[in-house]
């Protein structure tokens, strides 16, 4: 089982070879089939995000660039020219299903610099809440080699982490991982499930690289992406993208490789908060707030007695009781000066004091309990 039918949130990576034909024009029929596939999932309450290559390939045609290796300025120019054509193709595909698309362009800093990560996550969450299909791509127009993801397989894995996706689908030119390259070795065996990524699995992927003429990713990059996704609690499905309605095909039992996650998305996120971020300050809370946090509730301003340290919105902070015991760590939604101004206030009074509200001081989703603090 791929888990695709049960997933709440699915990220699908679509490569250039599926989207763009040899003549440099969009594959309109494939896009229409894929949109119908995604619309079927959306109709049963699932959220679908698309990580889409293709801007540079489409831009080549519009700018008349020869099919050769491009310089970085040429690639950036092609991306700028092709991105609008790419979005138009996606919009035309989803329009018959009443679904709006939205363009989201990212660089590596957007998923690795914490404040930008929070902003990117908030934007994508808002789009999903509005019923929009986010179409995400690397911002090739401005990106440099130092801040590139390198390929859209890795970008898709980072997006899966960003949004807490349950399943990442990597549409490939082969139907999964094999013990050797099946195009060269007739004895190669398909591997339907990878419970854990090992050096042996990665060695198999290194021998099964795709040799397409448009995109940049091969099987090794897909396994590298699966490792990123697994650490974030997301399963990865690698399957043949050229099938009619490839998502339905996977659900129907067509051949694919499923890389199982190491944990759940929520647990991975909480572990990241608890173990990877240095606290910039602390919020000292009363007994009622301490008990609420222990029960998995958000930390409201009304229960905060004191603010310690200097921190910005999105920084990690400690949550301590009045005896100095650490209860939790979390990502705060207000900078320190504003947090001090709203200490002890009820939620409905915050906007009148600050002129805005960002909800609770620390949302329950962004709180990781200390080991001894379980309710």
Curated annotation (Swiss-Prot):
Substrate binds at residues 53, 140, 152. InterPro entries: AceGlu_kinase-like_sf, Asp/Glu/Uridylate_kinase, G5K_ProB, Glu/AcGlu_kinase, Glu_5kinase, Glu_5kinase/COase_Synthase, Glutamate_5-kinase_CS, PUA. It catalyses: L-glutamate + ATP = L-glutamyl 5-phosphate + ADP. The keyword Kinase applies. It comes from the Bacteria. Keywords: Amino-acid biosynthesis, ATP-binding, Cytoplasm, Kinase, Nucleotide-binding, Proline biosynthesis, Transferase. ATP binds at residues 13, 172-173, 216-222. One of its GO terms (biological process) is L-proline biosynthetic process. One of its GO terms (cellular component) is cytosol. Gene3D superfamilies: Acetylglutamate kinase-like, PUA domain. One of its GO terms (molecular function) is ATP binding. Pathway: Amino-acid biosynthesis; L-proline biosynthesis; L-glutamate 5-semialdehyde from L-glutamate: step 1/2. Its EC number is 2.7.2.11. It is found in: Cytoplasm. Belongs to the glutamate 5-kinase family. Catalyzes the transfer of a phosphate group to glutamate to form L-glutamate 5-phosphate. This is Glutamate 5-kinase. It comes from Phenylobacterium zucineum (strain HLK1).
């Amino acid at each position: 089982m791929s888990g695709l039918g049960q997933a709440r949130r699915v990220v699908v990576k679509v490569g250039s070879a599926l989207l763009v034909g040899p003549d440099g024009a969009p594959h309109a029929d494939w896009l229409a089939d894929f949109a119908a596939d995604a619309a079927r999932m959306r109709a049963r309450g699932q959220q679908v995000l698309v990580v889409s290559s293709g801007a540079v390939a489409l831009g080549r045609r519009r700018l008349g660039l020869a099919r050769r290796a491009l310089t970085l300025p040429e690639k950036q120019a092609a991306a700028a020219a092709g991105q609008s054509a790419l979005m138009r193709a996606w919009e035309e595909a989803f329009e018959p299903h009443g679904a709006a698309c939205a363009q989201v362009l990212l660089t590596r800093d957007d998923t690795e610099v914490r404040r930008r990560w929070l902003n990117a996550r908030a934007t994508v969450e808002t789009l999903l809440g509005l019923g929009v299909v986010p179409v995400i791509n690397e911002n090739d127009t401005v990106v440099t080699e130092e801040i590139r993801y390198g390929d859209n397989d890795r970008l898709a894995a980072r997006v899966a982490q960003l949004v807490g996706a349950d399943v990442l689908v990597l549409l490939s030119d082969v139907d999964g991982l094999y013990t050797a390259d099946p195009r060269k070795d007739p004895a190669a065996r398909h591997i339907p499930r990878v419970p854990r990524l090992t050096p042996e699995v990665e060695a198999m992927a290194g021998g099964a690289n795709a040799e397409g003429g448009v995109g940049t990713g091969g099987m090794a990059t897909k396994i590298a992406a699966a490792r990123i996704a697994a650490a974030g609690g997301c399963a990865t499905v690698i399957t043949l993208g050229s099938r009619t309605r490839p998502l339905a095909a996977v659900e129907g039992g067509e051949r694919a490789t499923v890389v199982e996650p190491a944990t759940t998305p929520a647990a991975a996120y909480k572990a990241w908060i608890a173990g990877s971020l240095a606290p910039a300050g602390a919020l000292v809370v009363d007994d009622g707030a301490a008990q609420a946090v222990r029960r998995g509730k958000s930390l409201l301003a009304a229960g905060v007695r004191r603010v310690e340290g200097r921190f910005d919105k999105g920084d990690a902070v400690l949550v301590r009781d009045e005896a100095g015991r650490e209860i939790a760590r979390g990502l705060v939604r207000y900078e320190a000066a504003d947090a001090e101004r709203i200490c002890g206030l009820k939620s409905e009074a915050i906007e009148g004091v600050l002129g805005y509200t960002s909800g609770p001081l620390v949302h329950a989703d962004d709180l990781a309990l200390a080991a001894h603090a379980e309710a």
